[in-house]
């Protein structure tokens, strides 16, 4: 499984790097990021689309036509529209989530930013997000872009992943630690 994961990661890095170079040449990194975000939203909102990109049952031609139609319908044209078609034609749609994440990372590094994935038990207000960004900027020494995900199962607190660092202040983790400590005592 680790071999498959590193294969996808390698494919994602190569495709994201290539897309970034083209976007940089066309001076359209921001619009490419925006279009990738729109496609990612479509992906997270549709089980059928996730099945299309991950299933080997669909032929390259079927994937190409479907992705082309979806991109056109969503108004994703130009560089990203063509890129999605190339990825479909090359049977690499399974790597799209990784490609999008890798592109964001490359673009953030180019802007001198670092990206942080934040998991919260509830939606963060814009004031909370700004305070978190300022705190993380103090730790990282760079501007920080945060990607917030809501997961009620952590009960409270935050889990922040920034580069190779992870800060877990979730209530779930604290309760698990307490449970372990009580087992050792009793």
From Swiss-Prot:
- Chief localisation class: membrane
Please provide one cellular component term from the Gene Ontology annotations of this protein. plasma membrane
Question: What keywords does the record list, in alphabetical order?
Answer: ATP synthesis, Cell inner membrane, Cell membrane, CF(1), Hydrogen ion transport, Ion transport, Membrane, Transport
User: Pfam families from the xrefs?
Assistant: OSCP
GO MF terms, alphabetically ordered: proton-transporting ATP synthase activity, rotational mechanism
Q: Which PROSITE patterns match?
A: ATPASE_DELTA
| Location(s), subcellular | Cell inner membrane
Membrane-topology descriptor: Peripheral membrane protein
Question: Which InterPro entries did the record assign?
Answer: ATP_synth_OSCP/delta_N_sf, ATPase_OSCP/d_CS, ATPase_OSCP/dsu
HAMAP family from the xrefs?
ATP_synth_delta_bact (MF_01416)
Subunit comment: F-type ATPases have 2 components, F(1) - the catalytic core - and F(0) - the membrane proton channel. F(1) has five subunits: alpha(3), beta(3), gamma(1), delta(1), epsilon(1). F(0) has three main subunits: a(1), b(2) and c(10-14). The alpha and beta chains form an alternating ring which encloses part of the gamma chain. F(1) is attached to F(0) by a central stalk formed by the gamma and epsilon chains, while a peripheral stalk is formed by the delta and b chains.
What's this chain's function?
F(1)F(0) ATP synthase produces ATP from ADP in the presence of a proton or sodium gradient. F-type ATPases consist of two structural domains, F(1) containing the extramembraneous catalytic core and F(0) containing the membrane proton channel, linked together by a central stalk and a peripheral stalk. During catalysis, ATP synthesis in the catalytic domain of F(1) is coupled via a rotary mechanism of the central stalk subunits to proton translocation.
Sequence similarity:
Belongs to the ATPase delta chain family.
The name of this protein is: ATP synthase subunit delta
Q: Which organism is it from?
A: Brucella abortus (strain 2308)
